[in-house]
A protein has these predicted regions:
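Conserved dinucleotide-binding and phosphotransfer motif residues
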Residues: 10, 37, 142
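Cell-envelope/extracellular polymer assembly enzymes that use nucleotide-activated donors
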Residues: 134
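Acidic helix N-cap motif at the loop->helix transition within catalytic regions
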Residues: 1-10
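Catalytic donor-sugar/metal-binding loop of nucleotide-sugar-dependent glycosyltransferases
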Residues: 103-104, 126-127, 137-154
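Acceptor/aglycone-binding surface of glycosyltransferases and processive sugar-polymer synthases
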Residues: 13-36, 41, 53-129, 155-179, ...
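Hydrophobic residues within well-ordered alpha-helices
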Residues: 7, 63, 138-141
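Glycine/small-residue-rich loop that forms an oxyanion/phosphate-binding "nest" at active or ligand-binding sites
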Residues: 50
Length: 186
């Protein structure tokens, strides 16, 4: 993909990893960079064209207005989830997070999120955290605030999802095991 070239053309700060280390390592590296360079916020944003950059300001405005530690660009604040297999899985994660934390996140699998400085520091010092629903639940249990803003997302503009039916099931099992078992020891 042309993400690197586009970001360079736009004058963005760039961390060019020598190899693909995966989402978690990439995210942790970016969080460390953001903390080291004094950023107040960092936005997680997919490069496949689904996320509309004009909503970044909406996420920042929400964080600044209500002090949210995390703001999720949600597909489902005011729109109901489809009844696809993927959305049924998302509903199950939403329900489990609600049971475990008492708080509802309507779109816990959204990859469009803003993280405030306090959360970035958590990622800086704890390499067991990942940018996935189970970390959102952990942050809620620890008293951090998460809010959501309604956004529109486009169909994928490029690339291919790593999720196929088998990986989707593995993802769901991992999230559920982490939420139900691992987090009790944190």
């Amino acid at each position: 993909d042309r993400t690197l070239a586009i970001c360079k053309d736009l004058g963005c700060d760039i961390i060019d990893m020598p190899i693909n280390c995966g989402l978690t390592v990439g995210f942790q590296t970016a969080a460390r960079y953001a903390v080291d360079h004094g950023y107040d916020y960092m936005v997680q944003f997919d490069a496949d064209g689904q996320h509309c950059p004009e909503y970044i300001k909406v996420l920042v405005d929400r964080a600044q207005s209500d002090g949210s530690d995390i703001v999720i660009g949600s597909r489902f604040v005011s729109v109901r989830k489809d009844k696809t297999l993927r959305m049924i899985g998302s509903r199950m994660i939403t329900g489990l997070i609600k049971i475990l934390t008492g708080k509802r996140i309507s779109d816990p699998t959204s990859g469009f999120r803003l993280f405030g400085r306090d959360i970035l520091k958590k990622y800086y010092y704890d390499n067991t955290l990942n940018p996935e629903p189970e970390s959102l639940a952990l942050f809620l249990k620890q008293g951090y605030s998460i809010s959501e803003v309604q956004v529109k997302m486009r169909e994928r503009q490029g690339g291919e999802s790593y999720l196929n039916p088998v990986r989707s099931m593995q993802y769901m099992v991992r999230v559920f095991v982490t939420l139900l078992v691992v987090q009790w020891f944190r």
